[in-house]
Amino acid sequence: MSEQEVTYTTLRFHKSSGLQNPVRPEETQRPRDVGHRECSVPWKFIVIVLGILCFLLLLTVAVLVIHIFRDGQEKHEQEKTLNNLRQEYQVMKNDSSLMEEMLRNKSSECKALNDSLHYLNREQNRCLRKTKIVLDCSQNKGKQVEGYWFCCGMKCYYFIMDDKKWNGCKQICQDYNLTLLKTNDEDELKFLKSQLQRNTYWISLTHHKSKEESQQIGDRPSKLDSAARNSVPNRQKCAYLSSFSTEEDDCARTHGCICEKRLNKFPIPGSCAKGRTQSALQRDEDES
């Protein structure tokens, strides 16, 4: 019996040990898989969150870079515009200075011209107040000649109101020991134009169409409008003075006359001065 018990015990030991402690690979690996699964889920969530944060950070950096670049461009454009405005302002300032300088110069010139004009007006009025006299003369033939004369400076001008041909004006000036007006002085012509009491007066200038040249008594050329020379074809032309210009006309037509003489020999035709004696006029000559 002892041998059976030993054998039984041995079998029972081996059997009980095999039944009570069954070892399975799945059971030994299950706790590890659960622990691994429990640990992997939080790390995935953290990675996703970190990725989103990195994306947002990169997006923010990109937006900031774009804004900084755009602000830099706008600042550069503003500085460029500001420099252009400064240059334009400087140019306008220089132009304004030049305009002010020109205005001052023009004002000075205008003032000088006004002073000269006032002086000439005073001198002109002084001359006219001293010497202007209306004459009513009669020639030896009994024909009455109306006119007036005045002196200014060293010249006296005798205006004959009767209409005569150019040769007639030349002759009547010679009868009074005068000469038909001959001048090339623009200032003198302007002065005489301002004193005209009628439209036109002959002066000492003739022009022949065939020769296309001007001839003036005293061998002095005169400036005339070339268009006026063509107004009367193939006829001798003579110059006349109007209140507007110096022009030419047919010498056979009639205009008034302007005679002249210098003060060293006063132009008194006999004793035909109306309201004045020859001695009184001579005293005027001496005083002038």
From Swiss-Prot:
CDD domains associated with the record: CLECT_NK_receptors_like
Classification via PROSITE patterns: C_TYPE_LECTIN_2
Native source organism of the sequence: Mus musculus (Mouse)
Source taxon at top rank: Eukaryota
Domain C-type lectin: 144-263
Protein's name in the database: Killer cell lectin-like receptor 2
Annotated PANTHER family: KILLER CELL LECTIN-LIKE RECEPTOR 2
GO (cellular component) term, any one: plasma membrane
Binding partners and assembly: Homodimer; disulfide-linked.
Membrane topology annotation: Single-pass type II membrane protein
One Pfam family here: Lectin_C
One of the protein's GO biological processes: cell adhesion
Topological domains, Extracellular: 67-288
Disulfide bonds: C151-C156, C169-C257, C173-C259, C238-C251
Keywords of the record: Cell adhesion, Disulfide bond, Glycoprotein, Lectin, Membrane, Receptor, Signal-anchor, Transmembrane, Transmembrane helix
One GO MF term attached to the UniProt entry: carbohydrate binding
Function noted in UniProt: Receptor on natural killer (NK) cells for class I MHC.
